[in-house]
Amino acid sequence: CLGENVPCDKDRPNCCSKYECLEPTGYGRCYASYYSYKKKTL
């Protein structure tokens, strides 16, 4: 488990259960990979 705000692979998500792998803001221009973010609890 890597934690929050670290690069992750959306095809092989190894984020913890409380995190999800999402495109960061500026993906493709500033960032080349997905990052793990805290899941928004509803």
Curated annotation (Swiss-Prot):
Free-text tissue specificity from the UniProt record: Expressed by the venom gland.
Subcellular location: Secreted
Keywords, sorted A to Z: Calcium channel impairing toxin, Disulfide bond, Ion channel impairing toxin, Knottin, Neurotoxin, Secreted, Toxin, Voltage-gated calcium channel impairing toxin
Signal peptide (UniProt feature, chain positions): none
Main location: secreted
GO molecular-function terms, A-Z: calcium channel regulator activity; sodium channel inhibitor activity; toxin activity
Intrachain disulfide bonds: C1-C16, C8-C21, C15-C30
Function: Inhibits voltage-gated calcium channels (Cav) in rat cerebellar granule cells.
Protein name (database record): Omega-theraphotoxin-Asp3a
